[in-house]
Protein backbone atom coordinates (compact mmCIF):
# COMPACT_ATOMS: atom_id res chain seq x y z
CA UNK A 1 0.00 0.00 0.00
CA UNK A 2 2.77 2.40 0.93
CA UNK A 3 4.60 1.48 -2.27
CA UNK A 4 1.66 2.58 -4.35
CA UNK A 5 1.47 5.98 -2.55
CA UNK A 6 5.21 6.60 -3.03
CA UNK A 7 4.89 5.73 -6.71
CA UNK A 8 1.99 8.19 -7.12
CA UNK A 9 3.90 11.01 -5.40
CA UNK A 10 6.97 10.32 -7.50
CA UNK A 11 4.88 10.36 -10.68
CA UNK A 12 3.38 13.79 -9.86
CA UNK A 13 6.78 15.17 -8.93
CA UNK A 14 8.36 14.03 -12.19
CA UNK A 15 5.37 15.40 -14.13
CA UNK A 16 5.71 18.81 -12.42
CA UNK A 17 9.42 19.02 -13.23
CA UNK A 18 8.80 18.01 -16.84
CA UNK A 19 5.99 20.57 -17.32
CA UNK A 20 8.14 23.31 -15.76
CA UNK A 21 10.97 22.52 -18.16
CA UNK A 22 8.61 22.66 -21.15
CA UNK A 23 7.18 26.02 -20.02
CA UNK A 24 10.65 27.53 -19.58
CA UNK A 25 11.68 26.32 -23.02
CA UNK A 26 8.55 27.75 -24.64
CA UNK A 27 9.10 31.07 -22.81
CA UNK A 28 12.66 31.35 -24.12
CA UNK A 29 11.52 30.60 -27.66
CA UNK A 30 8.74 33.23 -27.48
CA UNK A 31 11.11 35.83 -26.05
CA UNK A 32 13.53 35.17 -28.90
CA UNK A 33 10.77 35.51 -31.51
CA UNK A 34 9.37 38.72 -29.98
CA UNK A 35 12.78 40.37 -29.66
CA UNK A 36 13.72 39.40 -33.20
CA UNK A 37 10.44 40.73 -34.67
CA UNK A 38 10.77 43.98 -32.69
CA UNK A 39 14.34 44.45 -33.94
CA UNK A 40 13.28 43.84 -37.57
CA UNK A 41 10.38 46.32 -37.27
CA UNK A 42 12.67 49.04 -35.87
CA UNK A 43 15.24 48.53 -38.63
CA UNK A 44 12.60 48.57 -41.39
CA UNK A 45 10.93 51.67 -39.94
CA UNK A 46 14.22 53.54 -39.90
CA UNK A 47 14.99 52.59 -43.49
CA UNK A 48 11.50 53.46 -44.73
CA UNK A 49 11.61 56.93 -43.12
CA UNK A 50 14.94 57.69 -44.71
CA UNK A 51 13.55 56.88 -48.15
CA UNK A 52 10.29 58.83 -47.82
CA UNK A 53 10.82 61.36 -50.60
CA UNK A 54 7.10 61.99 -51.10
CA UNK A 55 7.52 62.52 -54.85
CA UNK A 56 4.85 59.97 -55.74
CA UNK A 57 2.15 61.63 -53.63
CA UNK A 58 -0.78 62.55 -55.90
CA UNK A 59 -1.28 66.32 -55.98
CA UNK A 60 -4.85 66.95 -57.08
CA UNK A 61 -5.61 70.05 -55.02
CA UNK A 62 -5.09 71.52 -51.58
CA UNK A 63 -4.50 68.77 -49.03
CA UNK A 64 -5.95 68.79 -45.53
CA UNK A 65 -2.85 67.08 -44.18
CA UNK A 66 0.63 68.45 -44.73
CA UNK A 67 2.96 65.66 -45.84
CA UNK A 68 6.34 66.25 -44.22
CA UNK A 69 9.38 65.42 -46.33
CA UNK A 70 12.32 64.36 -44.18
CA UNK A 71 14.91 64.28 -46.96
CA UNK A 72 13.78 67.09 -49.29
CA UNK A 73 14.00 70.83 -48.58
CA UNK A 74 11.81 71.93 -51.50
CA UNK A 75 8.52 73.11 -49.95
CA UNK A 76 6.67 73.16 -53.26
CA UNK A 77 6.61 69.38 -53.82
CA UNK A 78 3.44 69.13 -51.72
CA UNK A 79 1.95 72.56 -52.55
CA UNK A 80 -0.50 73.78 -55.17
CA UNK A 81 -0.39 77.09 -57.01
CA UNK A 82 -3.36 78.80 -58.67
CA UNK A 83 -2.68 81.49 -61.26
CA UNK A 84 -5.65 83.72 -62.16
CA UNK A 85 -5.57 85.71 -65.40
CA UNK A 86 -8.05 87.73 -67.53
CA UNK A 87 -9.54 86.33 -70.74
CA UNK A 88 -7.49 88.90 -72.65
CA UNK A 89 -4.32 86.92 -71.90
CA UNK A 90 -5.56 83.70 -73.54
CA UNK A 91 -6.92 85.63 -76.52
CA UNK A 92 -3.66 87.45 -77.16
CA UNK A 93 -1.43 84.38 -76.74
CA UNK A 94 -3.64 82.36 -79.12
CA UNK A 95 -1.85 79.06 -78.50
CA UNK A 96 -3.69 75.89 -77.52
CA UNK A 97 -0.62 74.53 -75.71
CA UNK A 98 0.39 77.65 -73.80
CA UNK A 99 -0.63 76.20 -70.42
CA UNK A 100 1.49 73.08 -71.02
CA UNK A 101 4.41 75.32 -71.93
CA UNK A 102 4.06 77.30 -68.71
CA UNK A 103 3.70 74.10 -66.66
CA UNK A 104 7.04 72.90 -68.01
CA UNK A 105 8.61 76.25 -67.17
CA UNK A 106 7.21 76.16 -63.63
CA UNK A 107 8.76 72.69 -63.32
CA UNK A 108 12.21 74.28 -63.72
CA UNK A 109 11.43 76.38 -60.63
CA UNK A 110 10.51 73.37 -58.49
CA UNK A 111 6.76 73.18 -59.11
CA UNK A 112 5.85 69.65 -60.28
CA UNK A 113 3.60 69.14 -63.29
CA UNK A 114 0.02 69.04 -62.05
CA UNK A 115 0.62 71.34 -59.07
CA UNK A 116 0.00 74.58 -61.01
CA UNK A 117 -3.58 75.46 -62.00
CA UNK A 118 -4.57 78.16 -64.50
CA UNK A 119 -7.90 79.90 -63.87
CA UNK A 120 -9.47 82.42 -66.24
CA UNK A 121 -11.85 85.24 -65.37
CA UNK A 122 -13.65 87.59 -67.75
CA UNK A 123 -13.81 90.77 -65.67
CA UNK A 124 -13.26 92.20 -62.21
CA UNK A 125 -16.93 91.93 -61.26
CA UNK A 126 -17.09 88.21 -62.02
CA UNK A 127 -13.88 87.53 -60.15
CA UNK A 128 -14.81 89.58 -57.08
CA UNK A 129 -18.13 87.78 -56.66
CA UNK A 130 -16.74 84.26 -56.96
CA UNK A 131 -12.92 84.16 -56.83
CA UNK A 132 -12.56 80.49 -55.76
CA UNK A 133 -9.17 80.71 -54.08
CA UNK A 134 -8.71 76.96 -53.67
CA UNK A 135 -4.92 76.49 -53.81
CA UNK A 136 -2.23 76.65 -51.15
CA UNK A 137 -0.86 79.72 -52.97
CA UNK A 138 -3.04 81.99 -55.14
CA UNK A 139 -1.55 84.62 -57.46
CA UNK A 140 -3.97 86.98 -59.23
CA UNK A 141 -2.94 88.90 -62.38
CA UNK A 142 -4.94 92.11 -62.88
CA UNK A 143 -4.46 94.24 -65.99
CA UNK A 144 -4.40 97.93 -65.07
CA UNK A 145 -7.18 99.78 -66.88
CA UNK A 146 -7.57 103.53 -66.71
CA UNK A 147 -10.79 104.46 -64.96
CA UNK A 148 -10.95 101.21 -62.96
CA UNK A 149 -8.36 102.12 -60.33
CA UNK A 150 -10.96 102.22 -57.57
CA UNK A 151 -12.47 98.86 -58.55
CA UNK A 152 -9.01 97.25 -58.63
CA UNK A 153 -8.01 98.77 -55.30
CA UNK A 154 -11.18 97.57 -53.60
CA UNK A 155 -10.90 94.13 -55.21
CA UNK A 156 -7.43 93.92 -53.68
CA UNK A 157 -8.79 94.85 -50.26
CA UNK A 158 -11.51 92.26 -50.74
CA UNK A 159 -9.44 89.21 -51.66
CA UNK A 160 -6.32 90.00 -49.61
CA UNK A 161 -8.42 89.86 -46.45
CA UNK A 162 -11.00 87.57 -44.90
CA UNK A 163 -14.44 89.00 -44.26
CA UNK A 164 -17.50 87.89 -42.28
CA UNK A 165 -20.67 89.34 -43.82
CA UNK A 166 -24.40 89.49 -43.13
CA UNK A 167 -27.27 90.58 -45.39
CA UNK A 168 -28.67 94.11 -44.97
CA UNK A 169 -32.35 95.00 -45.27
CA UNK A 170 -32.06 98.74 -45.93
CA UNK A 171 -35.81 99.13 -46.52
CA UNK A 172 -36.63 98.28 -42.89
CA UNK A 173 -33.58 99.10 -40.78
CA UNK A 174 -30.98 101.75 -40.11
CA UNK A 175 -27.37 100.61 -39.87
CA UNK A 176 -24.21 101.83 -38.18
CA UNK A 177 -20.57 100.76 -38.35
CA UNK A 178 -19.04 99.72 -35.04
CA UNK A 179 -15.33 100.15 -35.80
CA UNK A 180 -12.60 100.47 -38.41
CA UNK A 181 -12.90 96.80 -39.36
CA UNK A 182 -16.64 97.15 -40.05
CA UNK A 183 -17.46 98.05 -43.69
CA UNK A 184 -20.41 97.80 -46.05
CA UNK A 185 -19.52 95.91 -49.22
CA UNK A 186 -21.59 96.51 -52.33
CA UNK A 187 -21.31 94.44 -55.53
CA UNK A 188 -23.08 94.46 -58.86
CA UNK A 189 -22.98 95.62 -62.46
CA UNK A 190 -23.57 99.23 -61.36
CA UNK A 191 -23.61 100.21 -57.69
CA UNK A 192 -24.62 103.66 -56.50
CA UNK A 193 -24.73 103.92 -52.71
CA UNK A 194 -26.15 106.93 -50.87
CA UNK A 195 -26.29 107.47 -47.11
CA UNK A 196 -28.05 109.80 -44.71
CA UNK A 197 -26.52 110.03 -41.20
CA UNK A 198 -29.05 110.26 -38.36
CA UNK A 199 -29.04 111.92 -34.97
CA UNK A 200 -30.36 110.35 -31.77
CA UNK A 201 -33.90 111.37 -32.76
CA UNK A 202 -33.43 109.54 -36.12
CA UNK A 203 -33.59 112.84 -37.98
CA UNK A 204 -31.25 113.35 -40.90
CA UNK A 205 -27.99 115.22 -40.34
CA UNK A 206 -27.69 117.46 -43.39
CA UNK A 207 -30.25 115.38 -45.28
CA UNK A 208 -33.91 114.45 -45.27
CA UNK A 209 -34.73 110.79 -44.64
CA UNK A 210 -37.73 111.03 -46.96
CA UNK A 211 -35.81 112.59 -49.85
CA UNK A 212 -33.11 110.40 -51.40
CA UNK A 213 -31.88 113.33 -53.49
CA UNK A 214 -30.51 114.90 -50.29
CA UNK A 215 -28.51 111.80 -49.34
CA UNK A 216 -24.71 111.82 -49.59
CA UNK A 217 -23.32 109.73 -52.47
CA UNK A 218 -20.44 107.48 -51.30
CA UNK A 219 -20.25 105.23 -54.39
CA UNK A 220 -21.31 106.09 -57.92
CA UNK A 221 -21.86 103.47 -60.67
CA UNK A 222 -19.16 101.14 -59.34
CA UNK A 223 -18.94 97.37 -59.74
CA UNK A 224 -17.44 96.93 -56.30
CA UNK A 225 -17.63 99.41 -53.43
CA UNK A 226 -16.33 99.08 -49.89
CA UNK A 227 -18.20 101.81 -48.02
CA UNK A 228 -16.78 103.43 -44.88
CA UNK A 229 -18.84 105.90 -42.85
CA UNK A 230 -18.58 107.52 -39.41
CA UNK A 231 -18.61 104.87 -36.70
CA UNK A 232 -21.38 104.58 -34.09
CA UNK A 233 -23.80 106.74 -36.10
CA UNK A 234 -27.00 105.30 -37.55
CA UNK A 235 -27.42 105.72 -41.31
CA UNK A 236 -30.32 105.34 -43.70
CA UNK A 237 -29.09 103.85 -46.99
CA UNK A 238 -30.22 103.92 -50.58
CA UNK A 239 -28.74 101.40 -53.03
CA UNK A 240 -29.55 100.60 -56.67
CA UNK A 241 -31.10 97.29 -55.66
CA UNK A 242 -31.88 96.17 -59.22
CA UNK A 243 -28.19 95.98 -60.17
CA UNK A 244 -26.48 95.77 -56.80
CA UNK A 245 -26.37 94.01 -53.42
CA UNK A 246 -24.94 95.32 -50.16
CA UNK A 247 -23.80 93.48 -47.03
CA UNK A 248 -22.57 94.38 -43.57
CA UNK A 249 -19.04 92.99 -43.24
CA UNK A 250 -16.27 92.74 -40.67
CA UNK A 251 -12.64 92.33 -41.68
CA UNK A 252 -11.28 89.30 -39.80
CA UNK A 253 -7.66 89.53 -40.88
CA UNK A 254 -5.29 89.02 -43.81
CA UNK A 255 -5.77 86.17 -46.28
CA UNK A 256 -2.06 85.42 -46.44
CA UNK A 257 -2.11 82.81 -49.20
CA UNK A 258 -3.15 85.39 -51.82
CA UNK A 259 -0.99 87.84 -53.78
CA UNK A 260 -1.92 90.30 -56.54
CA UNK A 261 0.26 91.26 -59.49
CA UNK A 262 -0.80 94.49 -61.18
CA UNK A 263 0.03 94.34 -64.88
CA UNK A 264 0.90 97.79 -66.23
CA UNK A 265 0.07 101.21 -64.84
CA UNK A 266 2.41 103.96 -63.73
CA UNK A 267 2.04 103.31 -60.00
CA UNK A 268 1.16 100.27 -57.95
CA UNK A 269 -2.13 100.50 -56.08
CA UNK A 270 -1.31 100.45 -52.37
CA UNK A 271 -3.87 99.31 -49.80
CA UNK A 272 -1.47 98.96 -46.87
CA UNK A 273 -2.16 102.55 -45.80
CA UNK A 274 -5.59 101.35 -44.63
CA UNK A 275 -5.41 101.25 -40.79
CA UNK A 276 -7.42 98.02 -40.82
CA UNK A 277 -4.71 96.26 -42.85
CA UNK A 278 -2.62 94.43 -40.28
CA UNK A 279 0.11 93.37 -40.43
CA UNK A 280 1.37 95.95 -42.92
CA UNK A 281 2.84 93.42 -45.37
CA UNK A 282 2.82 94.21 -49.08
CA UNK A 283 1.39 91.36 -51.16
CA UNK A 284 0.69 93.55 -54.18
CA UNK A 285 3.34 94.04 -56.84
CA UNK A 286 3.57 95.45 -60.35
CA UNK A 287 5.16 94.20 -63.57
CA UNK A 288 5.70 96.29 -66.70
CA UNK A 289 3.19 95.77 -69.48
CA UNK A 290 4.57 94.42 -72.75
CA UNK A 291 2.88 91.25 -73.97
CA UNK A 292 1.15 88.53 -71.97
CA UNK A 293 3.88 86.02 -72.77
CA UNK A 294 6.39 88.44 -71.23
CA UNK A 295 4.16 88.82 -68.17
CA UNK A 296 3.92 85.06 -67.62
CA UNK A 297 7.66 84.62 -68.13
CA UNK A 298 8.26 87.22 -65.42
CA UNK A 299 5.87 85.46 -63.06
CA UNK A 300 7.62 82.12 -63.62
CA UNK A 301 11.01 83.71 -62.97
CA UNK A 302 9.98 85.28 -59.68
CA UNK A 303 7.33 82.84 -58.43
CA UNK A 304 9.46 81.50 -55.60
CA UNK A 305 10.26 85.01 -54.35
CA UNK A 306 6.58 85.90 -54.57
CA UNK A 307 5.41 83.01 -52.39
CA UNK A 308 8.01 83.89 -49.76
CA UNK A 309 5.83 86.83 -48.66
CA UNK A 310 2.79 84.55 -48.49
CA UNK A 311 1.71 81.90 -45.98
CA UNK A 312 0.57 78.49 -47.17
CA UNK A 313 -2.89 77.31 -46.26
CA UNK A 314 -3.18 73.56 -45.76
CA UNK A 315 -6.90 73.43 -46.57
CA UNK A 316 -8.99 74.43 -49.55
CA UNK A 317 -10.71 77.75 -49.18
CA UNK A 318 -13.53 79.09 -51.31
CA UNK A 319 -12.99 82.80 -51.00
CA UNK A 320 -16.47 83.57 -52.24
CA UNK A 321 -17.93 82.01 -49.11
CA UNK A 322 -16.79 84.99 -47.04
CA UNK A 323 -19.36 87.10 -48.79
CA UNK A 324 -22.30 84.80 -48.15
CA UNK A 325 -21.57 83.62 -44.62
CA UNK A 326 -24.27 84.51 -42.11
UniProtKB/Swiss-Prot annotation:
Chain segments carrying region CNP motif: 165-167
GO CC, any one term: viral outer capsid
Protein task: Calcium-binding protein that interacts with rotavirus cell receptors once the initial attachment by VP4 has been achieved. Rotavirus attachment and entry into the host cell probably involves multiple sequential contacts between the outer capsid proteins VP4 and VP7, and the cell receptors. Following entry into the host cell, low intracellular or intravesicular Ca(2+) concentration probably causes the calcium-stabilized VP7 trimers to dissociate from the virion. This step is probably necessary for the membrane-disrupting entry step and the release of VP4, which is locked onto the virion by VP7.
Post-translational modification: N-glycosylated.
Family recorded in the similarity comment: Belongs to the rotavirus VP7 family.
Keyword Metal-binding among UniProt keywords: yes
One GO molecular-function entry: metal ion binding
Region entry GPR motif, spans: 253-255
Residues modified by glycosylation: 69
Compartments (UniProt record): Virion; Host endoplasmic reticulum lumen
Location of the region described as LVD motif in the Swiss-Prot/TrEMBL record: 237-239
Pfam families named among the record's database cross-references: VP7
InterPro entries given in the database record: VP7, VP7_1, VP7_2
Location (main, coarse): virion
Oligomer and partners: Homotrimer; disulfide-linked. 2 Ca(2+) ions bound at each subunit interface in the trimer hold the trimer together. Interacts with the intermediate capsid protein VP6. Interacts with the outer capsid protein VP5*.
Domain of life of the native organism: Viruses
Keywords: Calcium, Capsid protein, Disulfide bond, Glycoprotein, Host endoplasmic reticulum, Host-virus interaction, Metal-binding, Outer capsid protein, Signal, T=13 icosahedral capsid protein, Virion
Miscellaneous comment: Some rotavirus strains are neuraminidase-sensitive and require sialic acid to attach to the cell surface. Some rotavirus strains are integrin-dependent. Some rotavirus strains depend on ganglioside for their entry into the host cell. Hsp70 also seems to be involved in the entry of some strains. In group A rotaviruses, VP7 defines the G serotype.
UniProt keyword annotation of Glycoprotein present: yes
Name assigned to this protein: Outer capsid glycoprotein VP7
Secretion signal, residue range per the UniProt entry: 1-50
Amino acid sequence: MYGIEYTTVLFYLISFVFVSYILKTVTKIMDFIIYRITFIIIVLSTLSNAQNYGINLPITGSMDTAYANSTQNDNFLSSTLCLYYPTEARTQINDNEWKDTLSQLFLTKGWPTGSVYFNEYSNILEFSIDPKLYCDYNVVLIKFTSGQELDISELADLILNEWLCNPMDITLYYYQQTGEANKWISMGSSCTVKVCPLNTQTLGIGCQTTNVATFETVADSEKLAIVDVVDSVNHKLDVTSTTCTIRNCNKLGPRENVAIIQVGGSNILDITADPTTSPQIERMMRVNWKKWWQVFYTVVDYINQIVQVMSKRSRSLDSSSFYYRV
